Curated annotation (Swiss-Prot):
It is found in: Cytoplasm. Its EC number is 1.1.1.1. One of its GO terms (molecular function) is alcohol dehydrogenase (NAD+) activity. This is Alcohol dehydrogenase 1. Its main location: cytoplasm. Binds 2 Zn(2+) ions per subunit. It catalyses: a primary alcohol + NAD(+) = an aldehyde + NADH + H(+); a secondary alcohol + NAD(+) = a ketone + NADH + H(+). Zn(2+) 2 binds at residues 101, 104, 107, 115.
Length: 353
């Protein structure tokens, strides 16, 4: 078993009060408990959820002070005495779901994210915007040794989340899926997972740069909501028979796209809600929902099996992660870009900088 020298202090980005900003400072390195591992985080993806955690604008209380982040890829450097499924030296990832009880009805039916005792990385427990992070061994993502940690990091939330959403939609090879918010970090991977699963991807977002990116990633069509005169008609026209997509994956972080989806989804189609606009409501006309037999579902991250499946697509080279890497010290600048809607693809922070 390899031995690692573990420092007493480390660099981290800490939210010291609700609303932020983050403070780049040194904090102690924690020791893992009996069922936990300590991961030397090399890279961490930056997710819109991290911004919500800093701002505290979700109806779920955050830990304070808080180290955010839940897409941490690194190396296991220590483990508790009860841990047998993970070894020191393994490549592993910290996900949104840091731990669960493994004993409730949800955990026993592979719905661990719904566990009433779930621990959430970078929200209810400290996450991956630090050089050394703790996670329950049963829930760490096992990253194949051949995978590049820098590009693996965003798969640990964005990849798993959109892959699970596509599974929940029930779409089959040859069918069409509309991806709303396709130019962002989740959307860029959703397009690729859709292609890998044999689906026709219709990308919906705003701006020429995002359109170019979506087409390069394999979207069969791109609908620009900033220039279209009739979004509903354009989305339907992008499907082979003009009847609309079989499923809609809503990754948007504003409310309006959720209302629009009912108008263009195919009859007997499924709308999957993933994006979490603060304070938003989903309003759908009851008449249309009933007579067109529309299904509306929420999809929330993924379980342990979903995690390994999503990573397998990546390990086989079917998913490319378009990233921009900056030092951990620049995290607040990434949040500022996120607030302004200027992010294309996914930002990753390097914890060594």
């Amino acid at each position: 078993m390899p031995q690692f020298e573990i420092p007493e202090q480390q660099w981290a980005q800490v939210v010291e009060k609700k609303g932020g900003p983050v403070v780049f400072k040194q904090i102690p390195v924690q020791k893992p408990g009996p069922d936990e591992v300590l991961i030397n985080v090399k890279y961490s993806g930056v997710c819109h959820t991290d911004l919500h955690a800093m701002k505290g604008d979700w109806p779920l209380a955050t830990k304070m002070p808080l180290v955010g982040g839940h897409e941490g890829a690194g190396v296991v450097v220590a483990k508790g005495e009860l841990v047998t499924e993970v070894e020191v030296g393994d490549h592993a990832g910290i996900k949104w779901l840091n731990g669960s009880c493994l004993a409730c009805s949800f955990c026993m039916q592979a719905d661990e994210p719904l566990c009433p005792h779930a621990l959430l990385s970078g929200y209810t427990v400290d996450g991956s915007f630090q050089q050394y992070a703790i996670a329950k061994a049963a829930h760490v993502a096992k990253i194949p040794k051949g995978c590049d940690l820098e590009t693996t990091a965003p798969v640990l939330c964005a990849g798993i989340t959109v892959y699970k959403g596509l599974k929940e939609s029930g779409v089959r090879p040859g069918q069409c899926v509309a991806i709303v918010g396709a130019g962002g970090g989740l959307g860029s991977m959703a397009i690729q997972y859709a292609n890998a699963m044999g689906l026709h991807a219709i990308a919906i977002d705003g701006g020429e740069e995002k359109g170019k990116n979506c087409r390069e990633l394999g979207a069969q069509a791109y609908v620009d909501f900033t220039t279209t005169k009739d979004l509903v008609a354009d989305v339907k026209a992008a499907t082979p028979d003009g009847l609309g997509p079989h499923a809609v994956i809503l990754l948007a972080v504003s409310e309006k796209p959720f209302h629009q989806a009912v108008d263009y989804v195919r009859s007997r189609g499924t709308i999957i809600c993933i994006g979490l606009p603060a304070g938003a409501k989903f309003q759908a006309p009851v008449f249309d929902t009933v007579i067109r037999m529309i299904t509306i579902k929420g999809s929330y991250v993924g379980n342990r099996q979903d995690t390994q499946e999503a990573l397998d697509f990546f390990a086989r080279g079917l998913i490319k992660v378009p990233i921009k890497t900056v030092g951990l010290s620049k995290l607040q600048e990434v949040y500022d870009l996120m607030e302004e809607g200027k992010i294309v693809g996914r930002y990753v922070v390097d914890t060594s900088k």
